[in-house]
Amino acid sequence: MPFCLTETSLPFGKKYKGKVRDTYDLGDQLILVTTDRQSAFDRCLAAVPYKGQVLNLTSVWWFKNTQSIVPNHLIAVPDPNVAIAKKCKIFPIEFVVRGYISGSTSTSLWTQYQKGVREYCGITFPDGLRKNQKLESPVITPTTKETLHDRPISPHEIVAEGWMTQEDWDETSSYALKLFQHGMEVAQQHGLILVDTKYEFGRDAEGRIVLVDEIHTPDSSRYWLFNGYQERFDAGKEPENIDKEFLRLWFVDHCDPYKDEVLPQAPQELIVTLASRYIQLYEMITGESFVYDSNPGPVNDRILHNIQRWLG
């Protein structure tokens, strides 16, 4: 197995550790390091080779591909695992955009619909929809970014509760739908369906609304294979996907990932399969070949060298 990036320790500003990304604060700029940590159940399950590189470079590809729709926070990419970004004031709302009614978690649109819910996040859904059906047009089902847990919220509540102004909501929601429409079109050209995703927006030092965090990555989005979708849907079968669900299921079968203090180690073949799926998705999404590091070694050393070279 090649070297995995699970922890970073860089001599640049204050460090904030997220589930997957480590962020270093340079004042008006941020160093965003995407690691190979694979998280689920609110904890780190494993380290997946090349995952951080795939997520970072997929996001960078989309940032460049969508800058004519909305400006974004990206400044530079000094290393495959690293993005330098403008520090922005982030809106405390996640913009979840859905093109299909799907999902299996307790908060998913399909789970709520099955329970008889027909109004969700201020949107009214008709009777008679089937799981994995394409919606008449994409919808935004926003959630709040809160300490304990995010909660679904309607646009009216977002403004009434003071999360955002009406003007800011109108502008960001318009951007979100344009980004998703473009993402669906590009994905289809590459043999994929962009099912749903989430966006985050902020305001930069000049007062402009910009896209932040990540865009259309395998972690923030769900993708299905385009070929065969309609036939499988008509037959009542699940769409073919390339995602990490099988790793979650392995842990559920072998332990209680919510309660067990120590988790079993995932089999190496499972990790290799997941790494290859991430790389396959990168190549399908971008239409570009994945470039493997020609000088494998400690990733931290490479990152430090590349950032120092960029900083001059």
UniProtKB/Swiss-Prot annotation:
Gene3D superfamilies noted in UniProt: ATP-grasp fold, B domain, Phosphorylase Kinase, domain 1
PANTHER family, per database record: PHOSPHORIBOSYLAMINOIMIDAZOLE-SUCCINOCARBOXAMIDE SYNTHASE (PTHR43700:SF1)
Native species: Legionella pneumophila (strain Paris)
Catalytic activity: 5-amino-1-(5-phospho-D-ribosyl)imidazole-4-carboxylate + L-aspartate + ATP = (2S)-2-[5-amino-1-(5-phospho-beta-D-ribosyl)imidazole-4-carboxamido]succinate + ADP + phosphate + 2 H(+)
HAMAP family per record: SAICAR_synth (MF_00137)
Pathway: Purine metabolism; IMP biosynthesis via de novo pathway; 5-amino-1-(5-phospho-D-ribosyl)imidazole-4-carboxamide from 5-amino-1-(5-phospho-D-ribosyl)imidazole-4-carboxylate: step 1/2
A single Gene Ontology CC term: cytoplasm
GO molecular function: ATP binding; phosphoribosylaminoimidazolesuccinocarboxamide synthase activity
Protein name, per record: Phosphoribosylaminoimidazole-succinocarboxamide synthase
Enzyme Commission identifier(s): 6.3.2.6
Gene name of this polypeptide: purC
NCBIfam families in alphabetical order: PRK12607.1
Organism lineage string: Bacteria, Pseudomonadati, Pseudomonadota, Gammaproteobacteria, Legionellales
Similarity comment: Belongs to the SAICAR synthetase family.
Keywords: ATP-binding, Ligase, Nucleotide-binding, Purine biosynthesis
Single biological process term from Gene Ontology: 'de novo' IMP biosynthetic process
